Swiss-Prot record:
Species, as recorded: Vibrio vulnificus (strain CMCP6)
Family per similarity comment: Belongs to the polypeptide deformylase family.
Keyword field contains Metal-binding: yes
Gene Ontology MF annotations: metal ion binding; peptide deformylase activity
Active site: E134
Domain of life: Bacteria
Record GO biological process: co-translational protein modification; translation
Enzyme Commission number(s) of this protein: 3.5.1.88
Cofactor note text: Binds 1 Fe(2+) ion.
Cofactor: Fe(2+)
Protein encoded by which gene: def1
Catalysed conversion reaction: N-terminal N-formyl-L-methionyl-[peptide] + H2O = N-terminal L-methionyl-[peptide] + formate
Matches recorded under Pfam families: Pep_deformylase
Transmembrane segments annotated in the record for this chain: none
Protein name, as recorded: Peptide deformylase 1
């Protein structure tokens, strides 16, 4: 397994709409394993393939406290949304930024697991929010897209400043 590079906003590759996985192969399973390792290495609770410049419909999530219960969703599709919720979200592709995003409180999602078996999942609370956040990535959408243009610009400017600082430190 290997750690993949996470793209950061405003990288245009984050806007790419992911294509469905045609067949779960050993290559796809390696991508899944690398994504899980990357998610843990970056201390995230979710990661979409788009974030690591792989434009296929693959998501990994682990909201467990023990950080050893990874969930794999290949070709995920939300079948139903219920209620309203929202928490202050962050994102590995938008480091250091957080914002309140309106989301459904509960979702029903259909997907394939790491072995290509179809399953349906009823999710609520943090898991429901995380699923919606990661599936947005597969559509080329980021949580900052829910913000006002001014807030989005402030975040973009802050990230550019951090990037310039880091480049000077090298």
């Amino acid at each position: 397994m290997s750690v993949l590079q996470v793209l950061t906003f405003p990288d245009d590759r984050l806007r790419t709409v992911a294509k469905p996985v045609e067949k779960v192969t050993p290559e796809i399973q390696k991508i899944v394993d690398d994504m899980i390792e990357t998610m843990y290495d970056e201390e995230g609770i979710g990661l979409a393939a788009t974030q690591v410049d792989i434009h296929q419909r693959i998501v990994v999530i682990d909201i467990s406290e023990s950080r050893n219960e990874p969930m794999v969703l290949i070709n995920p599709e939300i079948l139903e949304k219920r209620g309203e919720d929202g928490i202050e979200e962050g994102c590995l592709s938008v480091p250091g930024a957080r914002a309140l995003v309106p989301r459904a409180a509960e979702v029903t999602v259909k997907a394939l697991d790491r072995d290509g078996h179809e399953f349906t999942l009823e999710a609520d609370d943090l898991l429901a929010i995380c699923i919606q956040h990661e599936l947005d990535h597969l559509q080329g959408k980021l949580f900052v897209d829910y913000l006002s243009p001014l807030k989005r610009k402030r975040i973009q400017d802050k990230l550019a400043k951090i990037k310039r600082f880091n480049e000077k430190q090298r």
